[in-house]
Amino acid sequence: MAVALAEAGHRVAVNYYERASRAEELCADLRARGFVAQPFQADVRDEPDVARMVAEVEAALGAVEIVVVNATGHQPLLSIEQQTWQSYLDQLEFFVKSPLLLVQAVLPSMRARGFGRVIQIGSEVVELGNPRFANYVAAKGAQLGQTRSWARELAASGITVNLVAPGWIPTERAFSATEAEKAAYAQAVPMQRMGVPEEVGRVVAFLASDDASFITGQKLSVNGGNTLE
């Protein structure tokens, strides 16, 4: 997503929590290609940390016009008997609290300029209802509701709010499945394959562009038709 936004001409701030080397490597690669990119450390579940990060981003790169909410944490499979309220809160911290803190931090300047793009990264699991995953599915469902409510509230201020719902995309961080598991998933997808990160990035860049100026409150599924509606 950072690459797609940079290629679309945006200055990119890459947030990281612990993996500084990966964020710095990504930004260095983008700068080598002539783009503007800089890493910023923060725990997006922590309000003071988010406020500090946004202030640092604005000082280094200018006003924040686009926010892509993509932070996530550990996602263990747990039966109903194994799940606790804390296991739900752990997911809500990433998918409801962190979007709230980020949007609250950038909203004053977005309102003042009459422009903003908020792009949440959701998941197809809300439609699929994956078993042993209710805490994650519930948090992602809440994130979708949050997106739609914000879209109505902020539309008159020139701020769009949308959600991209990817399927199972192989990424460096989260992809530890077996070949059999990957093959089984791909076979169930109408397009008979898994997606790639670049396909999600292009949709994010589209929603950030002027071409999407009249699109708000929408969920765009990037999953090869796996949740045909």
Model-identified regions with their sequence ranges:
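Canonical Rossmann dinucleotide-binding motif of NAD(H)/NADP(H)-dependent dehydrogenases/reductases
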Residues: 1-13
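Short, small/polar-rich loop/turn modules that mediate ligand/substrate recognition or access, typified
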Residues: 62, 155, 160, 215-217, ...
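Alpha-helical segment proximal to the catalytic Tyr-Lys
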Residues: 108, 152-156, 213
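A short, exposed helix-loop element centered on a Lys and neighboring polar residues
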Residues: 103-104, 148
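Substrate-binding pocket helix/loop in short-chain dehydrogenase/reductase
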Residues: 78-80, 84-92, 174, 181, ...
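Catalytic loop of short-chain dehydrogenase/reductase
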Residues: 73-74, 87, 91, 119-142, ...
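Catalytic Tyr-X3-Lys loop
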Residues: 65, 81-100, 115, 119, ...
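Short C-terminal tail/terminal secondary-structure segment
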Residues: 77, 128, 187-188, 193, ...
